[in-house]
Amino acid sequence: MENRTIKIKSKTNNNVRINIIPGHFATNHSHVNYYIDMTSLKTSYRMARDAAGELAMAYAHTTHIDTIICLEGTETVGAFLAEKLGHHGSGINEGNDIRVITPESNANNQLIFRDNIQNKIRDKQVLLLIASASTGKTINRSVECLSYYGGQLAGIAAIFSAIDEYNGIKIASVFDVSNIVDNDIVPYITLSPGECTMCKNGDKVDAIINSYGYSKL
């Protein structure tokens, strides 16, 4: 499977890269034809820093942010994003000490925050940062959590996004489906398991994937 890997570079910074692997992959709520491998971007401080710089441009002059909620292993990017926004010379967040937090998942797979950190959310302007937005379900779950704890959604950012917006809110991303199209390869698709054309064609599932990585079958 790994021998099918294709390297994709950001359109604005050649130092920011992800790998994509074509195939048949299953998440817990959809089937997709690419595994988006962000391992290097999440673990390399240089690449995470540069990716954060790209995301910061979407908010630096327009959006007040008190807190960044990091999901799907984006904490390193989130910390650099807070730094970029807080130290942007002419930005709206200049001098702000932006908080960077991560929720827990309880036994029912609900996102929760403990009592000691809830004051970083209540009545705060919150940016959601996720690794991948494909169906919007992770975003929906996060927005419900944010609403429960009294936070205000200021924006949504992703490393990779297959969707342009969520309920009218534009999703800022480092990579999107156009990065795949620009490399003259098959477009990215996401389907519900019951409507998966790859399953109907008898193509076996290559791996189960989530934000941590993949497990080959």
Predicted regions and their residues:
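Short glycine-rich phosphate-binding loop at a beta-alpha junction
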Residues: 63-73
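Active-site-facing substrate-recognition patch
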Residues: 1-64, 211-217
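PRPP-dependent phosphoribosyltransferase catalytic core
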Residues: 2-8, 12, 143-217
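Short, hydrophobic beta-strand segments that form beta-sheet elements in well-ordered domains
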Residues: 68, 99-102, 154-160
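Short amphipathic alpha-helix with an adjacent loop that forms part of the alpha/beta core around
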Residues: 60, 114-120, 187-190
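Hydrophobic Val/Ile/Leu positions in short beta-strands of Rossmann-like dinucleotide-binding domains
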Residues: 70, 128-129
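Short, well-ordered alpha-helices that flank and scaffold nucleotide-derived cofactor binding pockets
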Residues: 57, 83, 87, 144, ...
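Short, glycine/charge-rich flexible loops or terminal/linker lids adjacent to PRPP-binding catalytic cores
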Residues: 75-127, 134-140
